[in-house]
């Protein structure tokens, strides 16, 4: 039996067609903002409406509204910490998870605007959709390192990498080792699923959607991230 949590196994949300490719990168700029934060993620970061699985939002899956997903809660908490507005960019990179073995090809095809954003802080919150069988034959760590290098185009960028929201040891060890080697900040969030309140169980009929972070879970992710952002 595969060594992953039951919630990871329950995630039957497809890794493909999570968002219209023309919307993979979205930049939000605010008057007077200086700091630029880039979020690189998957459905937990943003997923377009998909009524066939009971999802009607266009933000981090299972959050009740855009303001409650971890991206927007992170920005809000960071603005409170700084006392000023924050610009941010969202790169929905499930495409990388599916095609990581292709190197820069998917990155150059879809994510150049996020690279050229030259963020001050790059948050890598991704991994749940990496095919574990493929990863056994072709470990994703090298591709992860190249992906981070691609997005962290600002030489002074601070990089934050998290483990998986659902416990997937096979991937977590690679992410943590890469962070340690390159001096990235590694933030653990994988323990959050031990608290059922962090997931949207009972709020959606589709088990995969319901396994995604609830508003409370999104807040906890945001708090962990902001705790490690030194300003």
Question: Residue locations for each model-derived region?
Answer:
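Alpha-helical structural signal in soluble globular domains
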Residues: 73-81, 146, 150, 154, ...
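Conserved beta-strand segments of alpha/beta enzyme cores
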Residues: 87-89, 158, 183-185
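N-terminal secretory targeting modules
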Residues: 1-40, 44-63, 76, 80-85, ...
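Second-shell loop/turn segments in exported
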Residues: 57-65, 133-137, 161-164, 207-211
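Catalytic His-Asp segment of secreted/periplasmic serine-dependent ester chemistry enzymes
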Residues: 165-231
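Conserved SGNH/GDSL esterase-like catalytic core that processes O-acyl groups on lipids
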Residues: 23-24, 31, 36-38, 46-134
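Charged helix-capping and loop-helix junction motifs
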Residues: 105-106, 137-146
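Active-site segments of SGNH/GDSL-like serine hydrolases
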Residues: 123-132, 145-177
